[in-house]
């Protein structure tokens, strides 16, 4: 055959084969047999295609089938592939290389050897060189990258794993773990890289795939790898360190050729830095690490650069500095001349800056000298101390007394109930007075409601609360129109210092003997002390002598010598008076004189201040009246400085507030702690009409003094007040400074305590004068002191106090008497103040000398008495000098006395300590060293006990009050919450609850949050010391951490990095609000310098900018040069300071890996999906479900639904899609799917559930979670699902934060900081200063389940979802505007009379009657069935009557169930629906026997925005009012977002979780940021705003409301789970308790295992059924899972074929007897059907009247007592009917008909009494009965035999 014919035939064959391959079914096996078998027996087979796919199959076929035959026939076959074996196919063999001749022997001549490889370079002239240079490293033999390298790298890079983590023995399909999108991405990258890939490359192991692709691989990197390398270098290398620099560095340093360079850069792709490297040194260090790793992987040794010339080259050439200067001198001169030439041309003075600097230096030196002088004169402390701090922005206003009154009254009510207040003591009286001072009509209604509804029958404490509460109400009514008063009822106290046997010195305040109350105190003060007459009169004598001396001295006619003699005599008399009085043994009692401890002095004619009895009497009368009746300061305005905690000033502020004054108090240490102190002070003492304003203020600053008074008096920018009182008590201590130690601090203290007090008074005078306020002078309480240098060592303190006394004279001599009045208070020894606290221990000793010391409250009472109206009136006539010194000035040598007393105490204590030590030593010697151990105290440290408790289940007897609910609700239509959890700023729901309730973590909470944040981990093994250890260890150090030490060790860090705080960049991709990045378009006006880029990037620049960019290929490089030309537009990043820099963030260190989520999932999904996964698993575990597949034991896979939703979805994914993709950053290819809101639901199902039930994905902005609950409840009640996962989630992001700010919706952190707010305070719902919501992030999830299923499974029930609804609002143009659509939940038409249907008892009666009717209908149907069977038999003799009977019985039974459910809906679950006279909320509560008054808590959406709280409070108050909530029954308002911030989609879920925790605990958490409630909200009197947690005696129901942007409103009402248990019988309840206990143990173990092994989330690898079972499981509604031997839940191989209800049952057998009996004339038949739910076994009267003791014992012992009683009751009724006798009415007892069990267990009838007589009369010889009952009904047939 000619060659051309062969060629033509081959071509035809090829075409035919290709056509056959593409157009026909694949029959390659047969085709191979034709080709390989005779007669063809092809020996050379060539595959034309991209990879050897068919060739590989042919090789395997040859080996399996033809290998032996070919060997026998000597056939040598060849299988080739076009893409791999082109050289063999075309016979392109290389020529053989001729053998090289053997190397000649080495020459022995001296002729130098000539190298042929390259000519020697000519020697160059040496040039100046650095001290040391490096030569390039020795070249490494080059080797191009292999296809496997490229393949391996691309796969690892896409999987975001290191090269070691990707096994080359695995296929792409195995590596991606079923992620089809990721697989497609990799295949696309390979296609882009290699051009062509084999068929199905994803199924071939990487090493095999690499080998296949190697044949066609040319050793050069393709587009994909080149692009990745260029992108990595441009995005991660420092500026200027481009592609060429990278390659040059690696080549020079390690001698790498082009091929190995590519390999190293490939490896670098799998080691890419997380962020751009900061410097070239960092970049080189990173490249070094890559190169070393490459060398280790490839088994090569990298050489390092060597010093040039090596060790034999000698020293490197070095040039000296002088020579270098000479060489460069001419160049420097030339450049300088050119610079000066250019300057002259531009008319610029090059020396202008230096000249200006000289002038500035003169000025600077002058100012510096002045500043140095000022600092030298005043000192550093003074200089820093006078800095102003006043800011009106930071003013805190507290005036919501109306709210705190209700809070205090309620707290007192529960304190009595819980036994914390058992007796009427001073504490309870003081609290009652405080409540009375705030009496108002709303408060009276509030208290009256609680007292009227206080169940006194519950115990003594309830009775006491009711009694005392009513007394308090009566007292409040009596003072409602009276002004508030300050009345101190505390016991006066005395100092007590004791020293115990061991030498411990103890000081305490004890009740003062004989002085029980303040009236006794005033009497004691009036009596004064009893000192000897001589001592008392000594001062008076001295004064009188001084006056005589002055008169004599004034005589002009007296000689000089006489005057001198008189002067000497005067001095001698004074000296004699100063001597101590001689002791007397005279038995006569000396005469004693007294003056009051507190008295008023009046200035005498000669200018001395003398005791004035009249004024003192007036003052003491005021004190006595104040002690009895109180003092009012209503409508008074006061300024108080120096009122820190523990000071007299703080006590004065308390008194002023209690008396109704408005007070400005200043503080020099403005902080949250300080403002919280004043806020709590106002909360306790603020009375009706009072107001407290706290401002930062430095009394040492003149600026602050003026600014403060301007603020107080300015009507527009300030308060617009007119002060009535000024109490300038600010001071700082100067201890330890004698006259030679007067320093900067002393001068500053003098400025505070004297100079600026005068300035402050002057400023007040100026303000009053400028406003014409001369008829209302302000009383100034001057803080005087008896210390006129007496103590010493106190700097200028005495001088400051003495200086104030000049105001007594200035009042007369200056012009401000009409504006200010002066009252000097000489303050005595006051125990416990900041200045006097160190002297407390000697107070008792001081008092023994007849002096009186005072407590802070006593001294404050003294001063407040000076501020009464009577004393104020006295001050307007003349300055008042009030001596409140307690006789201290009459005590000589006070300092020495104090020192002596202190020394005696300390010596006594020291002696006793020594004696105790000696005694202990003797005892230990005598009895052994351990003998005292039994007497020593040992502190027992609590250990953490992480319980994760389920709701507590009460004894069944405790639910007796709910017995009316029995059988009244269809539990199949009741949704309950069985588990919940969250991921939020405070960790999970348990740790958040700790903070919400108590403001701190419990020990258990602290351990758990420390684990969550990765601070501790569990360890079990050998510790660092080599000893076995099991427990917590520090994650960083590995050191053991005892759980009791966790709180002390980590709490500070935890609090700093949890909750609402300044944004932490590491949580948000490095986002820093201080440098919020934006882009601005800029057009360049000159050509830029060129830079390097890859070829692709260069052409992309060209495509975008056209002629405005030049690109050129760089010779000998793969890089291109790019230059942007003039006119190019660029987007240049810029930054601004963004003012929203605070947010609620998940705890720092929260790591999904710690919960067990695999790395590939973490890298794949959006962070919000991780939050939802963790929340879902925790919620399931909280439900007692440790394996979600267990659910399929009870339900079909189609009955588990998911309604989790979000407001926005995956924010990180959206950011990647839009921002990162646009900026050409690496982004995963399937990022789109992670941005979908339903993707989180998909991951829940794929990783955890494998459910096939309904899914709804709500998107309701901030109301998403409530919308989710609404959807879940719809699915449960409609029967579409029996279990639902509901919840919501959302993230915090830079983009969302910026846009919320643009809307003006969020809190401006910058402004809040200016106002002195900490990040934790910036969310303040319901307060008068709220100003925008605080964004947050996280997720919340609930497990909502059908109640019947929950009981059956034994899962815990946390609450009943009694009501849920969503609503839109009205027409408008504002999407975020708050609306009132959810008011429709209270819609109803009022009726004139109460509706009986709402009453549970009424509905119970109707339902009982309906059940009787259903039973009668069933009886008739069963009786008619026999007639029906006879008729059917006649019509169709071949009919299977037995099968027909079974089916008809089942139909009847199902119809009975259906009718009962219909009845339950009619009178139970849904009785209120579609009734316009019953509001949905009223009806939903009435189902459970509740009313609107039983709604205890309202959890508010409470976003901390102005509009929301006004609207939401209005909505709730309107709902409650419209539904008839009682006056005074204010609902507790819970505002959770003060703690968590606003997580948008997850907010409602967190609130619902909190509401469920409230139901479980009865504890209502307060809004701790509610420092002052908005006055506007006072109108909503049915809402209370607690700021502190309140432990109640139980909450029955709670409301949760949510308002979302976009017209979404929602409301959920959850009800206490006890009401579910009231529906079921005792046996069912006890069985449920047992199941729940078992589940708790499993959940407890699971949770602790998760903490130990970090495996909370245990992702599923497969569904619970096999691939073959999938369709069968979907299509069989009865398919249920079971537990395998391996402990997993799977579906059995054989699924149930028919329903259990279709099987023959007892009812069928029971009714079969009807056929025989109806045809027997000697038998009477009785049939009775009873619904199990109709039999009330809780009705003891019914049970006792109708059942014998034997029957009761039998039924109560049955597994289902109610069903057993129903069976016995139906049997009795059937027996009665079979007797055919007349009855005594429906109420007649049936006890005479007894049903007993025979030995075989069959029921037997025993007749007693009248029943036996009636049977005998009717001729009945015996009665037999058959009973059948299930969970729904009981059927009995009785036969009376005659």
UniProtKB/Swiss-Prot annotation:
Changing residue 600 to N: In strain: H518. One of its GO terms (molecular function) is fatty acid synthase activity. InterPro entries: 4-PPantetheinyl_Trfase_dom (IPR008278), 4-PPantetheinyl_Trfase_dom_sf (IPR037143), ACPS (IPR002582), Acyl_Trfase/lysoPLipase (IPR016035), Fas_alpha_ACP (IPR040899), FAS_alpha_su_C (IPR047224), FAS_alpha_yeast (IPR026025), FASI_helical (IPR041550). It comes from the Eukaryota. Mg(2+) binds at residues 1728-1730, 1828-1829. The active site is at 1262 (for beta-ketoacyl synthase activity), 1501 (for beta-ketoacyl synthase activity), 1542 (for beta-ketoacyl synthase activity). The modification O-(pantetheine 4'-phosphoryl)serine is found at residue 180. Residues 145-220 form the Carrier domain. One of its GO terms (cellular component) is cytosol. GO terms for biological process: fatty acid biosynthetic process; long-chain fatty acid biosynthetic process; mitotic nuclear membrane biogenesis; palmitic acid biosynthetic process. Residues 1079-1616 form the Ketosynthase family 3 (KS3) domain. Gene3D superfamilies: 3.30.70.2490, 3.40.47.10, 3.90.25.70, 4'-phosphopantetheinyl transferase domain, 6.10.140.1390, 6.10.140.1410, 6.10.250.1930, 6.10.250.1940. Pfam families: ACPS, adh_short, Fas_alpha_ACP, FAS_I_H, ketoacyl-synt, Ketoacyl-synt_C. Its EC number is 2.3.1.86, 1.1.1.100, 2.3.1.41. Fatty acid synthetase catalyzes the formation of long-chain fatty acids from acetyl-CoA, malonyl-CoA and NADPH. The alpha subunit contains domains for: acyl carrier protein, 3-oxoacyl-[acyl-carrier-protein] reductase, and 3-oxoacyl-[acyl-carrier-protein] synthase. This subunit coordinates the binding of the six beta subunits to the enzyme complex. Belongs to the thiolase-like superfamily. Fungal fatty acid synthetase subunit alpha family. HAMAP family: AcpS (MF_00101). This is Fatty acid synthase subunit alpha.
């Amino acid at each position: 055959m000619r060659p051309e014919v062969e060629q033509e035939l081959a071509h035809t064959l090829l075409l035919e084969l290709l056509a056959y391959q593409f157009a026909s079914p694949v029959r390659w096996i047969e085709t191979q047999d034709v080709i390989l078998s005779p007669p063809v027996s092809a020996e050379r087979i060539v595959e034309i295609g991209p990879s050897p796919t068919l060739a590989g199959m042919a090789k395997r076929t040859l080996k399996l089938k033809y290998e032996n035959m070919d060997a026998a026939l000597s056939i040598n076959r060849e299988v080739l592939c076009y893409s791999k074996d082109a050289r063999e196919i075309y016979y392109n063999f290389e020529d053989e290389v001729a053998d090289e001749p053997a190397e000649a022997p080495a020459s022995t001549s001296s002729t130098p050897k000539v190298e042929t490889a390259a000519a020697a370079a000519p020697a160059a002239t040496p040039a100046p060189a650095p001290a040391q240079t490096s030569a390039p490293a020795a070249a490494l033999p080059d080797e191009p990258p292999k296809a496997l390298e490229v393949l391996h790298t691309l796969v690892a890079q896409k999987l975001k794993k290191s090269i070691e983590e990707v096994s080359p023995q695995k296929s792409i399909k195995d590596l991606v773990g079923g992620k089809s999108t990721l697989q497609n991405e990799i295949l696309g990258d390979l296609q882009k890289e290699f051009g062509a890939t084999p068929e199905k490359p994803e199924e071939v192991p990487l090493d095999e795939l690499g080998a296949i692709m190697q044949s066609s691989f040319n050793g050069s990197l393709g587009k994909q790898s080149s692009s990745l390398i260029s992108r990595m270098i441009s995005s991660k290398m420092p500026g200027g360190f481009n592609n060429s620099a990278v390659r040059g560095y690696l080549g020079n340093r390690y001698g790498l050729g082009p091929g190995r360079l590519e390999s190293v850069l490939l490896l670098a792709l799998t080691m890419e830095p997380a962020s751009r490297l900061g410097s070239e040194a960092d970049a080189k260090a990173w490249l070094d690490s890559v190169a070393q790793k490459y060398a280790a992987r490839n088994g090569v040794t990298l050489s390092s650069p060597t010093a040039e010339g090596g060790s034999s080259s000698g020293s490197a050439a070095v040039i000296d500095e002088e020579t270098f200067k000479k060489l460069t001198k001419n160049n420097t001169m030339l450049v300088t001349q050119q610079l000066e030439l250019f300057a002259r041309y531009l008319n610029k003075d090059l020396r202008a800056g230096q000249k200006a600097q000289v002038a500035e230096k003169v000025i600077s030196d002058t100012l510096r000298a002045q500043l140095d002088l000022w600092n030298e004169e005043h000192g550093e402390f003074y200089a820093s101390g006078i800095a102003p701090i006043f800011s009106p922005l930071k003013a805190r206003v507290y005036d919501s007394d109306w709210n705190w009154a209700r809070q205090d009254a309620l707290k007192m009510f529960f304190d009595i109930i819980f036994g914390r207040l058992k007796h009427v003591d001073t504490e309870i009286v003081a609290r009652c007075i405080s409540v009375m001072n705030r009496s108002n009509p709303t408060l009276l209604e509030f208290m009256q409601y609680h007292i009227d509804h206080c169940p006194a029958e519950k115990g003594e404490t309830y009775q006491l609360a009711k009694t005392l509460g009513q007394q308090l109400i009566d007292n409040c009514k009596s003072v409602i129109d009276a002004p508030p008063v300050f009345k101190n009822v505390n016991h006066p106290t005395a100092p007590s210092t004791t020293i115990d046997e061991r030498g411990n010195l103890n000081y305490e305040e004890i009740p003062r003997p004989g002085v029980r109350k303040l009236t006794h105190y005033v009497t004691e003060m009036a009596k004064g002390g009893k000192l000897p007459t001589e001592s008392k009169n000594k001062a008076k004598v001295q004064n009188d002598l001084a006056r005589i001396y002055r008169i004599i001295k004034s005589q002009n006619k007296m000689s000089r010598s006489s005057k001198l003699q008189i002067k000497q005599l005067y001095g001698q008399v004074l000296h004699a008076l100063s001597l101590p009085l001689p002791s007397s043994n005279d038995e006569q009692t000396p005469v004693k004189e007294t003056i009051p401890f507190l008295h008023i002095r009046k200035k005498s004619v000669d200018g001395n201040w003398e005791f004035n009895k009249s004024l003192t009497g007036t003052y003491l009368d005021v004190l006595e009246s104040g002690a009895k009746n109180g003092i009012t300061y209503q409508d008074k305005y006061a300024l108080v400085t120096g009122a820190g905690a523990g000071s007299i000033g703080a006590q004065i502020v308390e008194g002023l507030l209690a008396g109704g004054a408005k007070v400005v108090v200043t503080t020099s240490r403005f902080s949250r702690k300080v403002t919280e102190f004043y806020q709590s002070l106002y909360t306790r003492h603020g009375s009706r009409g009072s107001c407290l304003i706290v401002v930062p203020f430095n009394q040492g600053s003149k600026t602050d003094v003026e600014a403060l008074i301007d603020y107080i008096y300015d009507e527009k920018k300030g308060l617009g007040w007119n002060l009535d009182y000024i109490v300038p008590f600010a001071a700082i201590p100067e201890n330890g400074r004698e006259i030679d130690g007067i320093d900067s601090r002393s001068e500053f203290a003098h400025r505070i305590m004297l100079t600026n007090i005068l300035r402050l008074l002057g400023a007040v005078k100026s303000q009053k004068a400028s406003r014409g306020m001369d008829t209302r002078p302000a009383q100034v309480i001057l803080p005087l002191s008896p210390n006129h240098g007496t103590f010493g060592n106190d700097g200028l303190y005495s001088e400051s106090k003495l200086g104030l006394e000049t105001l007594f004279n200035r009042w007369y001599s200056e012009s401000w008497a009409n504006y200010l009045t002066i009252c000097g208070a000489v303050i005595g020894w006051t125990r416990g103040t900041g200045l006097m606290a160190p002297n407390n221990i000697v107070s008792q000793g001081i008092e023994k000398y007849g002096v009186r010391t005072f407590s802070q409250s006593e001294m404050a009472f003294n001063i407040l008495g000076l501020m009464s109206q009577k004393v104020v009136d006295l001050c307007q006539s003349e300055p008042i000098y009030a001596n409140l010194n307690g006789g201290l000035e009459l005590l000589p040598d006070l300092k020495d006395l104090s020192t002596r007393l202190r020394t005696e105490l300390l010596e006594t204590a020291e002696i006793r300590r020594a004696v105790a030590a000696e005694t202990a030593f003797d005892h230990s010697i005598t009895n052994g060293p351990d003998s005292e151990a039994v007497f020593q105290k040992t502190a027992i440290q609590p250990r953490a006990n992480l319980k994760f408790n389920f709701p507590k289940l009460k004894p069944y007897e405790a639910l007796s009050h709910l017995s009316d609910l029995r059988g009244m609700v269809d539990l199949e239509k009741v949704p309950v919450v069985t588990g919940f959890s969250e991921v939020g700023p405070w960790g999970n729901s348990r740790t958040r609850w700790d903070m919400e309730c108590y403001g701190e973590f419990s020990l258990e909470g602290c351990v758990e949050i420390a684990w969550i944040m990765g601070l501790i981990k569990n360890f079990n093994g050998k510790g660092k010391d080599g000893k076995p250890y099991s427990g917590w260890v520090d994650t960083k150090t590995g050191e053991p951490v005892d759980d009791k030490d966790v709180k002390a060790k980590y709490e500070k860090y935890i609090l700093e990095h949890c909750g609402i705080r300044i944004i932490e960049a590491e949580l948000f991709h490095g986002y820093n609000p201080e440098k919020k990045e934006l882009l601005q378009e800029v057009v360049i006006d000159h050509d830029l310098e060129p830079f390097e880029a890859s070829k692709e990037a260069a052409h992309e620049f060209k495509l975008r900018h056209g002629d405005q960019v030049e690109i050129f290929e760089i010779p000998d490089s793969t890089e291109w040069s790019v230059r942007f030309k003039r006119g190019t537009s660029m987007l240049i990043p810029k930054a601004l300071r963004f003012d929203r820099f605070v947010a609620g963030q998940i705890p720092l260190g929260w790591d999904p890996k710690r919960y067990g989520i695999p790395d590939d999932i973490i890298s794949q999904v959006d962070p919000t999906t991780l939050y939802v996964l963790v929340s879902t698993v925790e919620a399931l575990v909280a439900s007692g479900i440790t394996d979600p597949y267990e659910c399929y034991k009870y339900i079909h896979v189609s009955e588990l639904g998911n309604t989790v939703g979000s407001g926005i979805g995956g924010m990180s994914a959206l950011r990647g899609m839009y921002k990162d993709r646009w900026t050409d950053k690496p982004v995963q290819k399937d990022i789109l799917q992670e941005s979908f809101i339903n993707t989180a639901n998909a991951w829940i199902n794929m990783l955890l559930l494998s459910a096939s039930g309904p899914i709804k994905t709500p998107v309701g902005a901030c109301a998403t979670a409530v919308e989710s609950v609404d959807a879940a409840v719809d699915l449960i009640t409609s029967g579409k699902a029996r279990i639902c996962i509901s919840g919501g989630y959302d993230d915090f992001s830079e983009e969302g934060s910026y846009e919320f700010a643009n809307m003006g919706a969020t809190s401006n952190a910058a402004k809040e900081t200016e106002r002195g707010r900490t990040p934790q305070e910036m969310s303040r719902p319901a307060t008068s200063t709220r100003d925008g919501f605080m964004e947050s992030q996280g997720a919340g999830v609930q497990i909502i389940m059908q109640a019947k299923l929950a009981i059956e499974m034994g899962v815990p029930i946390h609450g009943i979802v009694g009501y849920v609804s969503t609503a839109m609002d009205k027409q408008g143009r504002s999407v975020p505007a708050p609306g009132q659509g959810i008011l429709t939940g209270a819609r109803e038409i009022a009726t004139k009379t109460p509706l009986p249907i709402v009453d549970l008892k009424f509905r119970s009666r109707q339902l009982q009657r309906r059940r009787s009717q259903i039973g009668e209908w069933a009886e008739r149907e069963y009786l008619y069935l026999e007639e029906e069977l006879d008729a059917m038999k006649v019509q169709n003799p071949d009919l299977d009557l037995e099968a027909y009977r079974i089916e008809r019985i089942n139909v009847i039974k199902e119809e009975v169930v259906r009718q009962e459910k219909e009845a339950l809906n009619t009178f139970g679950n849904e009785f209120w629906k579609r009734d316009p006279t019953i509001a949905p909320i009223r009806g939903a509560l009435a189902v459970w026997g509740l009313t609107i008054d039983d709604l205890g808590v309202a959890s508010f959406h409470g976003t901390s925005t102005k509009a929301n709280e006004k609207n939401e409070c209005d909505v709730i108050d309107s709902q409650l009012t419209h539904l008839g909530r009682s006056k005074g029954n204010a609902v507790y308002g819970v505002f959770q977002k003060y703690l968590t911030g606003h997580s948008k989609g997850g907010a409602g879920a967190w609130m619902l979780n909190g509401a469920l925790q409230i139901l479980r605990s009865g504890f209502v958490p307060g809004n701790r940021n509610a420092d002052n409630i908005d006055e506007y909200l006072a109108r909503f009197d049915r809402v209370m705003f607690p700021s502190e947690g309140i432990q109640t005696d139980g909450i029955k129901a709670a409301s949760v409301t949510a308002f979302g942007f976009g017209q979404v409103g929602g409301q959920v009402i959850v009800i206490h789970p006890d009401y579910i248990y009231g529906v079921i019988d005792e046996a069912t309840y006890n069985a449920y308790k047992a199941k729940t206990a078992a589940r708790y143990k499993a959940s407890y173990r699971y949770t602790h295992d998760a903490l130990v092994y970090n495996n909370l989330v245990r992702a599923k690898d497969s569904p619970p059924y096999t691939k073959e079972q999938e369709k069968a499981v979907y299509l069989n509604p009865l398919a249920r899972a079971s537990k395998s031997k391996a402990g997993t839940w799977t579906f059995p191989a054989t699924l149930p074929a028919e329903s259990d209800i279709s099987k023959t049952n007892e009812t069928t057998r029971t009714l079969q007897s009807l056929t025989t009996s109806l045809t027997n004339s000697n038998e009477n038949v009785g049939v009775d059907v009873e619904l199990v739910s109709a039999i009330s076994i809780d009705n003891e009267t019914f049970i006792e009247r109708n059942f014998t003791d034997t029957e009761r014992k039998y039924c109560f012992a049955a597994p289902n007592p109610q069903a057993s009683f129903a069976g016995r009751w139906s049997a009795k009724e059937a027996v009665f009917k079979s007797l055919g006798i007349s009855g005594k009415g429906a109420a007649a007892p049936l006890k005479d008909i007894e049903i007993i069990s025979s030995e075989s267990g069959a029921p037997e009838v025993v007749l007693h009494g009248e029943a036996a007589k009636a049977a005998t009369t009717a001729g009945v010889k015996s009665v037999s009965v058959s009973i059948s009952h299930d969970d729904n009904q009981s059927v009995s047939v009785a036969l009376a035999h005659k």
